[in-house]
From Swiss-Prot:
Annotated organism of origin: Chromohalobacter salexigens (strain ATCC BAA-138 / DSM 3043 / CIP 106854 / NCIMB 13768 / 1H11)
Pfam families referenced in this protein's UniProt entry, alphabetically: GrpE
InterPro entries: GrpE, GrpE_coiled_coil, GrpE_head
Function of the protein: Participates actively in the response to hyperosmotic and heat shock by preventing the aggregation of stress-denatured proteins, in association with DnaK and GrpE. It is the nucleotide exchange factor for DnaK and may function as a thermosensor. Unfolded proteins bind initially to DnaJ; upon interaction with the DnaJ-bound protein, DnaK hydrolyzes its bound ATP, resulting in the formation of a stable complex. GrpE releases ADP from DnaK; ATP binding to DnaK triggers the release of the substrate protein, thus completing the reaction cycle.
Protein name per the record: Protein GrpE
Annotated gene: grpE
UniProt entry tagged with the keyword Methyltransferase: no
Cysteine disulfide partners in this protein: none
Subcellular localization: Cytoplasm
Family: Belongs to the GrpE family.
Length: 210
């Protein structure tokens, strides 16, 4: 005799319903499929962004070109400014030199007059007219004052060490009383114009005695 099927209890029915409900941590087939589609879309977008954009590349290249041109222009401007400053400085130096030494030729022409006046004053005997002596002396002083006004100064190295930069040795004489290479006589004074030698002093220089 066949047995009647057993009727499920309420507890068994509740358990079966719980098992049939999806759990929070479990994904359904539809959800899994949807997630796959989303991932594919995101990957496609990333790939699209990674693809080269010809217009963007051209724009970036143009920007780089302009930046380089700007840097070159700044460099050229700086170089031009430096060159202009150098030119201006050289021009100022040339003007200063011209101002200082424009009188050099004229001074050289006047120096023989000064030499003549000095020799005339030295050669006058004590019995010479005081008026004449005073006249020559005043003329010489006036001449020297004018030269000094324009930056001319005499080189009178009597008793000083011989300096070939500003002295010209006419002869050397043994002299045990002074150090060798000492100027013992000035035959003709030298002159400087604003610190530049116009004429060396002609001198006699001592040398060691034999």
């Amino acid at each position: 005799m066949a047995k009647d099927p057993q009727t499920p209890t309420d507890e068994e029915l509740a358990r079966a319903e719980r098992d049939a409900e999806p759990q929070p941590g479990d994904a359904t087939d539809d959800e899994v499929e949807l997630e796959g589609v989303v991932e594919d879309v995101e990957a496609s977008e990333a790939d699209a962004e990674a693809l080269e954009n010809p217009e963007a590349d051209a724009l970036a290249a143009r920007v780089e070109e302009l930046e380089q041109a700007l840097a070159d222009a700044k460099d050229q401007t700086a170089r031009a400014a430096a060159e202009a400053q150098n030119v201006r400085r050289r021009a100022e130096q040339d003007v200063e030199k011209a101002r200082k030494f424009a009188l050099e030729k004229f001074v050289k022409e006047l120096l023989p007059v000064v030499d003549s006046l000095e020799k005339a004053l030295e050669s006058m005997q004590e019995g010479a007219s005081e008026v004449h002596r005073e006249g020559v002396s005043m003329t010489l002083k006036l001449q020297l004052d004018v030269l000094a006004k324009f930056g001319v100064e005499a080189v009178d190295p009597q008793g000083e060490p011989f300096d070939p930069q500003v002295h010209e040795a006419m002869t050397m004489v043994p002299n045990p009383e002074v150090e060798p290479n000492t100027v013992i006589e000035v035959m003709q004074k030298g002159y400087l114009l604003n610190g530049r030698l116009v004429r060396p002093a002609m001198v006699v220089v001592s040398q060691a005695a034999n």
